[in-house]
A protein has these predicted regions:
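Aromatic- and Gly/Pro-enriched helix-to-coil junctions and flexible linker segments
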Residues: 1-30, 40, 47-48, 125-128, ...
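Acidic, low-complexity Ser/Thr/Gly/Pro-rich repeat segments typical of extracellular/periplasmic
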Residues: 2-161
Length: 383
């Protein structure tokens, strides 16, 4: 392992596992994304977004809003061979967001800019860096580049479903998100004046996931200086409420993880460190790929999809070991001796709770991407 600016890179190159695009809408009018067929037969909506899934964790800076668009060329010029983004003729403007849990980058079309034209054929080309020093192009977190450019053609449908709208980055109350099915089966959460107006048992957003870690990260036991106890007992009704935001602001949001503090001023969380992993914030608002808390969960078993084929699962375990060797130190979250209180993927047992998802992204990652703003869940959002 290494970094291009310091030493030769001794790590596997990045491979594209699949590229997906919006081909339909589900019953709730949300995007349905299917893999682009290598033979170019896929037909996508003109409002489509594109999801690229890789076999390695990426360097967030290479897929950031600043240079990330240059990692993908979508062009109607089928004759031009695209080796670098400079070769991309009349590219469709795209905005990337990175999901480290899934090792995916989603590229959405930029509103107000020229988009996909109905009935037109396009070529999608995934690009690596042009050289070792290039800031753009797909790279792994340790600097290893994309193994080779990948090109797939597709056609845009002549018409869209009438409900199709430009796809936007998800936003909402992901911190206090409630599970509607849970509300429907919880008597105290129903009616105009429920006994529990905050419906504590049905809050399934980021607040619940963070508080699940309070066994090791609380007021009395803030392991590594991190306090995630965001729930407290309301003595007036003898019920818990997710109403504490101070622990996150004081110990997590924008604060460098203790295990990444190296060098001068390393206690200050860095958004664009010269060396990835140095002084990484526990939670970096808007940037899940630079949020150490997610990586501490990723290196544990709760983030591994049990439905993966054996060979893919083994490669993922090897990649997780590379993360741990590079910068994710200490025990994972939760430690092996503790039972998991939530999962990022469905598990074998039906009683194991899976976190909510938003547009293909777990709600903790979605909350960080949306700005990582905690709030008092015991009061409703202002209209």
């Amino acid at each position: 392992m290494g970094e291009a600016s310091y030493q030769p890179i001794d790590a596997p190159p990045v491979h594209l596992i699949e590229a997906r695009a919006t081909t339909d809408l589900d019953q709730n009018y949300q995007p349905v994304r299917t893999p682009l067929a290598p033979d170019g037969s896929t037909v996508v909506l003109s409002t489509a977004s594109f999801v690229l899934k890789f076999d390695r964790f990426l360097l967030p800076g290479s897929v950031s809003g600043a240079v990330g668009p240059e990692s993908l060329c979508v062009s109607g010029d089928l004759a031009k061979q695209v080796r670098t983004y400079a070769d991309c003729v009349n590219p469709i403007p795209l905005a990337p967001t990175y999901n480290p849990v899934q090792r995916e980058v989603i590229f959405r079309q930029v509103e107000g800019m020229p988009g996909l034209v109905p009935g037109t054929r396009y070529a999608l080309t995934v690009l690596g860096p042009v050289d070792d020093a290039a800031p753009s192009g797909i790279r792994a977190f340790d600097g290893a580049p994309l193994a080779e450019s990948q090109r797939i053609e597709f056609t845009v449908a002549a018409t869209n479903p009438p409900q199709a709208m430009p796809e936007r980055q998800p936003s909402g109350d992901f911190y206090c998100q409630q599970d509607l099915e849970c509300i429907g089966r919880t008597p105290d959460c129903q009616g105009d004046a429920p006994k529990d107006p905050t419906c504590f048992p049905c809050v399934k957003g980021a607040a619940k996931l963070l508080n699940a870690c309070a066994g090791c990260h609380s007021d009395a036991n803030a392991a590594a200086g991190l306090n995630l106890a965001v729930a407290a007992l309301d003595p007036t009704v003898q019920q818990f409420r997710y109403n504490r935001v101070e622990p996150l602001y004081e110990t997590a949001i924008g604060h460098a993880a203790h295990q990444t503090q190296m060098g001068e001023r390393a206690h200050v969380g860095e958004k664009t460190p010269e060396r990835f992993g140095r002084a990484m914030p526990l939670i970096d608002p808007g940037n899940p790929g630079n949020s150490y808390l997610l990586y501490k969960i990723i290196v544990g078993q709760i983030a591994v999809d049990p439905s993966l084929p054996a060979d893919q699962a083994e490669r993922l375990r090897e990649e997780i070991e590379r993360l741990r060797a590079a910068f994710v130190m200490g025990l994972p979250m939760p430690p092996p001796a503790y039972p998991a209180s939530f999962w990022f993927h469905p598990q074998a047992s039906a009683d194991q709770e899976v976190t909510m998802y938003v547009d293909g992204m777990d709600i903790l990652t979605a909350w960080i991407l949306d700005g990582a703003e905690p709030r008092d869940c015991s009061v409703p959002l202002p209209p």
